[in-house]
Structures are given as C-alpha cells and as structure tokens.
C-alpha cells in the first residue's frame, strides 16, 4: 500500500524575522521528504516565507500586534493579554478552517499558541519551556499558564542543543517532565559557512565580527544602539546586518 502524502502547515510567529527564518530549513526538509507544505503567518514573517518559497501556498493569520512600550517585559505583556488572548482564539479558528479546506495532517507552529487542531498531529517549535520572571510568585503562575498552553500540542521541538553548550540556557533546560520534548539543535536558513548576502556585505572590509539583528521594535533599535556603542569602543571591525524590513 503506497504511503499517503502528508500535508503539513508551518506557521511561525511574526515577531521579528527570527521565527520565520528558522523555519526555512524545516520547510526544506519537509519538501525533501515529499510532504506537501502550506505556510501561514502575518506581516514581515509571511513576506519572508513568500519570498523564500514562492511556489508554496501561503495564508494570512491574525496578528498578535505585540508592542513594547516600556522597559518592563512583564508589564508590557500583561497589559496586552486581552488582545493576545483574542488573537490566539482567532488564530485557532483560522487554523481549523485551513485544516478543513486543505486536508492538513500535521502542524508545526513556531510560538503560535493558537495553531493546533484536534484532527492533526500538532508540534510547537519553541525555545521557551521555562519562563524566568524576577518575582517568584509571578514566575510560578506564568509557568503554569505556559504549561497549559503547551498541553495543546503533541510534541515540543526545541531549536537548541540538549546539553552544554547551548544558547537558551534555563529557558529550555532541563526538559519538562510529562511532555514529549525533542531538541533539534540550532536551526539556520543559511547553508554553508556564511550566507551569500553576508559575504557580499563583508567583502573587502576584513570584518572580524558580524552582528545580525532582528526582533520587534523598538527593542531591536535599542539593542542596535547599545551594540554600536560597544563596537566603537573595541578594536575589532564589525558589520551590522540590521534585520529591518523594507531597507
């Protein structure tokens, strides 16, 4: 009996370009395995996926529209929770519609907590399985909410190494008990030692350090300014890839 082709929905969060970019090697691997791939996101993340995979169907999902208006991350997220909760519900409705209309058999959701369906195998791609908050009581409560959200998924894929050295530290380690967790290692859309765009940017400049930025504003710009100040104080040569869409 021939194998049935799987139809996989890949849906990264639109929070900078990092989530969409790290889905690129997964999408290529799925295509190599013969799966039919459908893409879904919003904003710059969706634009990146459409540019990378113009031959694949791509659909708009509701936007979380998260904004950082203060330096307090907890307060920033807490005050936007009603809108985020509504967006997740709308995202879940949109996902169920895509599953019905396109015969989707599996979902890989990169940090989109509404992208799951009762009729599919659901995977969430995230490096954040432990939340870290300065207040112990808030941290416990936040992690209970996170675990409830993660329970909606059959598997958790962590884009990091299972052992030291790793990038995400306490956010991803140790693995959560009672969850199916797989550590994938680091994911990058770049093949080879250096992406062609970065090679062109550094050509003839003898740069020692490449700084690749992404993320939501205004935090991306704040980080850029801090790193620029530090770069000017160091003897090394830097090249900055600013991760600004439309530039």
Name what the model sees in each region.
Residues 118-183:
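Active-site-proximal region of nucleotide-activated glycan assembly enzymes
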Residues 74-114:
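Conserved nucleotide-sugar donor-binding subdomain of glycosyltransferases
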Residues 42-47, 107-114, 241-247:
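Short, polar loop motifs at secondary-structure junctions
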Residues 171, 185-247:
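Donor-nucleotide binding loops and adjacent catalytic segments primarily
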Residues 12-24, 218-221:
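A short, glycine/small-residue-rich beta-strand->loop->alpha-helix junction that serves as a flexible
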Residues 5-7, 13-14, 32-82:
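Conserved nucleotide-sugar phosphate-binding/catalytic loop shared by glycosyltransferases and other
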Residues 36-43, 156-161, 237-243:
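Short internal beta-strands
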Residues 20-30, 45:
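Short amphipathic alpha-helix
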């Amino acid at each position: 009996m021939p194998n049935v082709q799987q139809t996989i929905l890949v849906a990264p969060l639109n929070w900078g370009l990092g989530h969409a970019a790290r889905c690129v090697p997964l999408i290529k691997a799925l295509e190599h395995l013969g799966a039919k791939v459908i893409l879904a996101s919003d904003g710059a993340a969706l634009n990146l996926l459409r540019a990378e995979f113009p031959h694949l169907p791509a659909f708009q999902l509701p936007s979380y529209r998260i904004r950082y208006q203060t330096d307090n991350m907890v307060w920033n997220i807490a005050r936007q929770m009603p809108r985020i909760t509504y967006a997740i519900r709308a995202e879940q409705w949109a996902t169920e519609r895509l599953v019905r209309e396109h015969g989707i058999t599996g979902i890989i959701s990169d940090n989109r907590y509404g992208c799951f369906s009762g009729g599919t195998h659901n995977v969430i791609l995230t490096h954040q399985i432990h939340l870290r908050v300065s207040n112990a009581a808030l941290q416990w409560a936040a992690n209970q909410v996170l675990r409830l959200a993660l329970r909606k998924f059959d598997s958790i894929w962590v884009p990091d190494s299972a052992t030291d050295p790793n990038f995400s530290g306490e956010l991803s380690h140790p693995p959560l008990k009672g969850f199916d967790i797989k550590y994938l290692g680091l994911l990058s859309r770049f093949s080879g030692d250096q992406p062609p765009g970065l090679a062109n940017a550094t050509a003839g400049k003898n740069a020692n350090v490449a700084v690749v930025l992404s993320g939501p504003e205004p935090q991306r710009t704040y980080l850029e300014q801090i790193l620029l100040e530090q770069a000017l104080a160091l003897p090394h040569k830097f090249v900055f890839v600013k991760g600004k869409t439309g530039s």
